[in-house]
A protein has these predicted regions:
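N-terminal amphipathic/basic-hydrophobic helices that include classical n-h-c signal peptides
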Residues: 1-17
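A non-catalytic, helix-rich entry segment at domain boundaries
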Residues: 8-10, 68-157
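Metal-dependent nuclease catalytic regions and adjoining charged, substrate-binding loops involved
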Residues: 24-25, 205-210, 221-302
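Nuclease catalytic cores
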Residues: 31-75, 82, 90, 94, ...
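Mg2+/Mn2+-dependent nuclease catalytic core
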Residues: 153-256
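Short, acidic/hydrophobic/Gly-rich beta-strand patch recurrent on exposed beta strands
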Residues: 194-196, 323-330
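Structural detector for short beta-strands of small beta-barrel domains
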Residues: 300-321
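Beta-strand/loop nucleic-acid-binding surfaces
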Residues: 329-357
Length: 358
């Protein structure tokens, strides 16, 4: 490339890839973090304690259950058998829900596990399976009315589940949920569908730009891996409103390479760009002096976002778990702190109490 910059992905061959030492890759999520706030991306690469969330755990349980059902061995079952999918799907979801709960509770930073969200996850699973019926050319139906033969028809269009895609140059990677045959494709031969299952809030109108870019990212990596495939469509499947959104647009791989060039982590922290959108769901606020300063100076309204406080433990009753904390405030841009007049109490239980006793 010009001025010693690496050549674009499109002209790198396998031998070049092997000779190029890559210590990081760009993914849709890391790209989004970097654009929202370079400091957020930098902190995410520092090995800080992870934070779990119910939404993420529930979504993972649904995704893993769809994968399990797509890969289910039903070769020895009678094709006319009915009434099996409802119980099988629920059992698979319960198994994955239990696994996610263990992972959740084993994460250093986590809120309360909400068992009551299982029914919502089950509804999301039913919505996700409905998309597969539609793509296989089957009418919408209750799970109890799905025969073995019908599910085989679904499995026949599934090419891959939870597939990891990597660019030829090794700098870009993505993990897609489903790669399907598209029997309805009108472009010479059977097309493919890159499908990403979304269990969160659906868009009000069109796709969010970040989601659109994520889908195009997967589409373009799939095209690069299989250049002989003429038609590859990228779709976002929103189970909450049972709606499919198609992503359109030109290739974004060159744009991704440009982003990759800027994302090489240095010892010096990247610039922070605090904002309501960047900070609301940031998992690393407690390690960001700019977050504390912005809160302290009233530049951010912390009442409408998840808050990570920097506090000092004033008192703890080891038996009851009753604790008194004092909020600390920043004194400079480097993260120096001092005490304040704001104190608050809390009752600590379970792992939180065990950890603070240490």
């Amino acid at each position: 490339g010009v001025n010693g910059s690496p050549p674009p992905a499109s002209i790198l061959q396998d031998k070049d890839r092997m000779a190029t030492n890559q210590d990081y890759q760009i993914s849709p999520s890391s790209w989004n973090r970097f654009e929202e706030c370079p400091r957020k991306y930098w902190l995410s690469r520092q090995g800080l304690p992870r934070k779990a969330s119910m939404a993420a755990s529930s979504g993972t349980a649904i995704h893993n259950t769809v994968e399990d059902l797509c890969n289910l061995d039903i070769s020895d079952r009678d094709e006319g058998e009915m009434g099996w999918l409802h119980s099988t799907a629920r059992e698979a979801l319960e198994r994955n829900w239990k696994a996610e709960r263990q992972e959740f509770l084993g994460t250093p930073r986590h809120p309360r596990w909400k068992s009551e969200m299982f029914s919502k996850a089950h509804d999301g699973l039913i919505g996700a399976l409905g998309f597969l019926f539609e793509k296989a050319g089957l009418s919408k139906r209750e799970l109890s009315e799905v025969s073995i033969q019908s599910w085989r028809q679904v499995q026949d269009i599934v090419l891959e589940t939870e597939a990891t895609l990597e660019s030829d140059c090794g700098r870009m990677m993505g993990r897609l949920d489903l790669l399907l045959l598209d029997p309805s494709s009108s472009e010479g031969g059977v097309g493919w569908i890159v499908a990403d299952l979304k269990t969160g809030r659906p868009p009000r109108s069109g796709l969010d730009e970040k989601v659109r870019r994520q889908l195009l990212f997967y589409r373009d990596l799939a095209k690069q891996r299989s250049p002989e495939q003429n038609s590859i469509t990228a779709e976002g499947w929103y189970s909450s409103n049972e709606t499919i959104y198609v992503a359109h647009g030109p290739s974004i791989l060159e744009e991704a390479i440009d982003a990759w060039e800027s994302m090489k982590v240095t010892e010096e922290p990247f610039q922070a760009t605090p904002s309501e959108s960047a900070c609301s769901f940031c998992d690393w606020k407690a390690w960001c002096p700019d977050w504390w300063v912005s809160r302290s100076e009233g530049l951010l309204d912390g009442s409408r976002m998840f808050r990570d406080e920097v506090t000092e433990l004033v008192r703890l009753d080891h038996d009851s778990g009753a604790a008194l904390f004092e909020r600390t405030t920043p004194t400079d841009q480097e993260g120096s702190l001092e005490g304040s007049d704001y104190r608050f109490g809390a009752i600590l239980k379970g792992k939180a109490l065990e950890q603070i006793k240490q």
